[in-house]
């Protein structure tokens, strides 16, 4: 059943609003993936703070027009699933990458981050971005290592100074 104009406008407005607040987007082809697997993916997406939607390609072109994701327009060919990361830039890429490992039919087409098109070959860079908590933990570990190293150097300097006396 075809959508009427008001329904199309409502879909475009809803998805465009999400796109404006999103940090990154990933586009995939879902041909051959079962409904049960897609339902599992949707559930995982909700838990990860990822907005997923299957939208007609013509409507998706309208959605991404004049947004950071305009570079994705050429990827809207065939059945298209788009996911917007709203909390962490790598969330959708990580989710799709893990799902693609388990489902060979699932094909990631491309991603966009900060207005830049990221080809499939470089999706790993986006997927492996640390979360906020991971980044803070790494920073704290680095600072802790620096403090220990500084203490060791100070003690070595004191020892050398005492030996010189």
UniProtKB/Swiss-Prot annotation:
The keyword rRNA-binding applies. One of its GO terms (molecular function) is large ribosomal subunit rRNA binding. GO terms for biological process: translation. GO terms for cellular component: large ribosomal subunit. It comes from the Bacteria. Pfam families: Ribosomal_L10 (PF00466). Part of the ribosomal stalk of the 50S ribosomal subunit. The N-terminus interacts with L11 and the large rRNA to form the base of the stalk. The C-terminus forms an elongated spine to which L12 dimers bind in a sequential fashion forming a multimeric L10(L12)X complex. Belongs to the universal ribosomal protein uL10 family. This is Large ribosomal subunit protein uL10. It comes from Hamiltonella defensa subsp. Acyrthosiphon pisum (strain 5AT).
């Amino acid at each position: 059943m075809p959508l009427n104009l008001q329904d199309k406008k409502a879909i475009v407005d809803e998805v465009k609003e999400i796109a404006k607040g999103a940090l990154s987007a990933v586009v995939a082809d879902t041909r051959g993936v079962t409904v049960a697997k897609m339902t599992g993916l949707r559930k995982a997406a909700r838990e990860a703070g990822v907005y997923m939607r299957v939208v007609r390609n013509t409507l998706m072109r309208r959605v991404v027009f004049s947004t950071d994701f305009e570079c994705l327009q050429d990827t809207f060919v065939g059945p298209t699933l788009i996911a917007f990361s709203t909390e962490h830039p790598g969330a959708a890429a990580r989710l799709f990458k893990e799902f693609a490992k388990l489902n060979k039919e699932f094909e990631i087409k491309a991603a966009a981050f900060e207005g830049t098109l990221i080809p499939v070959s470089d999706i790993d860079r986006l997927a492996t971005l640390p979360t906020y908590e991971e980044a803070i933990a790494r920073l704290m570990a680095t600072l802790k290592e620096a403090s220990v190293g500084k203490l060791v150097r100070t003690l070595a300097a004191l020892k050398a100074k005492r030996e010189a006396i």
